[in-house]
Amino acid sequence: MKILRVILGNQLFPISQINLSKDVPIFMAEDSGLCSYIKHHKSKIALFFSAMRSYRDQLKNNSYKVIYYDANNNFSTSYFEKLFHEVKSNKIKKIEIYEIEDKPFEKDFLEFCKTNNIEINFLPSPMFIDSRGAFKYFLGDKKFHLQANYYKQMRKKMNLLLEDNKPIGGKWSFDEDNRKKLPSGYKIPKLPTIKPYKEFSEISNVININFSNHPGELHSWMPHSYEQIVEWLEIFFKDRFREFGHYEDAIDKNEHFINHSVLSSSLNLGLITPKEVIDKSIAYAKKNDIPLNSLEGFIRQIIGWREFIRGIYQNYGDQMVTSNYWNHKNKLTAAWYDGSTGIEPLDEAIKGAQKYGYTHHINRLMILSNIMNLCNIDPNEIYKWFMEMFIDSSDWVMVPNVYGMGTFADGGIFATKPYICGSSYILRMSNFKKGDWCDIVDGLYWKFIEEKKDFFITNPRLSLMIRALEKLNPDRKKHIFECANNFINKVTQ
């Protein structure tokens, strides 16, 4: 039986893990449709093409047979037309492919194989540590799922940071220790400079011709090969790991990276596996006496949140994308793309996303999605914006993060409450100064709570907000509600 191995642009796993006979051809394709069904950030498209071509080169250097369609070869032809041509030409009867994480593409791929009577073999994905089956077993028949419970299970399963099956340091999470504001004058380490892929100029031309109306500036600043991401990780360990935990939630008006590893896009492309990242981080921490709150916080992001989000998506993604718990209907305007809303922290976060396709998780959760949610933006609009604006976006990433964590649009499948805040939290965690924007954000916050009073008053954890709302000075309340309404009218449709 003639076999074809298909490798997608987010399955660029280290060559050592490919486990394939060199007689079996490998199919890869750059595809205009996959770049444009959502207007992906220009730097994201550049990263994908750079990483895919670099991976193609590595495969060929290791004597694998690669069938590669680049942007100069039938670029406008659909992905499945290209695949069909190779299947038919080579009389392929079976396709091997790693598990496809994004459900819409997985559905299309299964339909292609069924229509063309091709056997398909899904291989376990090195992109994750836990299996889909194991996560489903964790879910059981419960209706609500706590990330903290899953994280404990993963720590025990992997025997990480344990002593006599109990957490080192006496607790599972040091999150409460990781909420420090950056001290005045703190010197933030610079990210390493990455050498662009050798064909980056050609890739840039493709993007400028075909995707000129997509958001974002066009840069090559992220690793596009295994060798580069290993070096990137080592520099993170050396320069930023030690104080990563302390300032994990800090916001800086001029800086979008602070001490974060910025590994998400590389992990989501498959350039490095989470298992390797965990192993290297544990080894480095032991040798260099990294504080436990930094090590634990870093590990929790990978084996806690990342694995958990993937599992939630696989089991609840279809339900989430049809959910709109708050019945929000407002639409975004151009101000949310060019950073001209008038709320300074929001505009700086937007401009960071425009420039880099990246900003860290607190900007994403407590500024971007928070303010969008407070403005009653339709969660489908928010999902689309996050998919467009971030270099690490994928359906499996953004569906749970937007519909679940960011907006509570799913009604609480795994989030214990809506993550919303007024200006006081932003001021406490950042170096932004008080200004007119504070009245707008505070108005949006209290207006949201008043409009959803029935929800908040029935939740023991949240009913305090209603009591605080009732104590607002009437003149203050009138002023900030006017500010909020004017803002919503200005920046939504």
Name each model-derived stretch.
Residues 47-67, 96-97, 357-380:
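Hydrophobic/aromatic-rich, well-ordered segments within soluble, folded domains that form packed cores
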Residues 4-10, 210, 221-244, 295-333:
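Active-site cores of enzymes that catalyze phosphoryl transfer or operate on phosphate-rich substrates
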Residues 158-298, 448-451, 456-493:
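Glycine/tryptophan-enriched, flexible segments
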Residues 442-444:
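Long, charge-rich alpha-helical interaction segments
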Residues 6-10, 29-30, 69-71, 97-100, ...:
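Short His-Asn-centered micro-motif
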Residues 1-71:
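N-terminal beta-strand-loop-alpha-helix module at the start
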Residues 262, 267, 272-440:
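Active-site-proximal binding-pocket segments
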